[in-house]
């Protein structure tokens, strides 16, 4: 009975103080990038970690078997040959570093880069024995620079857009040991960079309705 009474008291205390709880809702979930702006001269540094595990092959939304991949025409040989290897699984650890600085209340500048650690297990074609082998790569990816511009900053409605460019600072010549050679240039998925300049654009919208916040982010 004493335990029940104590639990009831704690429950009542939680109800009393519930209206004064400070919620961490000034930022979107950690996987959402470029969601908020800063006040003039504010600086923020960030670190995010993400792990990805991949193990299936698709052509659009159609799942492919490993035999189907290795029997498909190889574009590198003008379609006259087939693929000698196929991916079986891949893991990637991504360490993301970011910095934000606001030169004014309306504009927030952003820099982002990532350190990537990749490992892929591949399978040889049956005529070559069908054995598995692993390839690895690591290094920094492409540098992203962007500007986040506030369009609207009202009590119940916030709106902003981001313009950014991706600079090809990541390596596209990672090499490793494979059954073919001890210094083979690895496939596109194992490279750290894209080798191209790319632009990107997104729009943020945040509405506050009573105690609820609803946000959307659209990428282009």
Regions found by a protein language model. Name each.
Residues 177-183, 220:
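Short, surface-exposed, charged loop/turn segments at secondary-structure junctions
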Residues 19-158, 164-167, 185-193, 198-201:
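Transmembrane beta-barrel domains of Gram-negative outer membranes and organellar outer membranes
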Residues 197-220:
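Aromatic-anchored, glycine/proline-accented short structural segments
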Residues 13-14, 143, 210:
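Generic cytosolic/nucleocytoplasmic N-terminal low-complexity/intrinsically disordered segments
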Residues 1-26:
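Cleavable N-terminal export/targeting peptides
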Residues 172-177, 215-217:
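A short secondary-structure junction signal
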Residues 125-126, 176-178:
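Short, glycine/charged-enriched secondary-structure capping and boundary segments
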């Amino acid at each position: 009975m004493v335990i029940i009474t104590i639990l009831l008291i704690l429950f009542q205390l939680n109800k009393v103080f519930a209206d004064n709880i400070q919620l961490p809702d000034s930022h979107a979930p950690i996987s959402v990038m470029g969601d908020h702006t800063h006040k003039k001269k504010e600086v923020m540094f960030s670190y995010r970690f993400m792990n990805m595990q991949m193990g299936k092959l698709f052509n659009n939304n159609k799942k492919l078997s490993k035999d189907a991949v290795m029997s498909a025409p190889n574009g590198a040989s003008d379609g006259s040959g087939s693929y000698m290897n196929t991916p079986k699984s891949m893991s990637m650890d991504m360490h993301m570093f970011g910095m934000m600085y606001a030169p004014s209340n309306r504009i927030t500048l952003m820099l982002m880069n990532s350190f990537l650690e990749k490992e892929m297990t591949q399978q040889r074609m049956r005529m070559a024995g069908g054995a598995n082998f692993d390839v690895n790569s690591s290094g920094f990816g492409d540098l992203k620079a962007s500007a986040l511009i506030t369009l609207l900053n009202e009590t119940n409605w916030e709106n902003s857009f981001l313009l950014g460019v991706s600079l090809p600072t990541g390596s596209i010549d990672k090499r490793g040991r494979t059954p073919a050679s001890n210094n083979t240039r690895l496939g596109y998925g194992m490279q750290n960079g894209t080798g191209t300049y790319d632009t990107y654009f997104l729009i943020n919208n945040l509405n506050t309705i009573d105690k609820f916040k609803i946000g959307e982010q659209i990428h282009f």
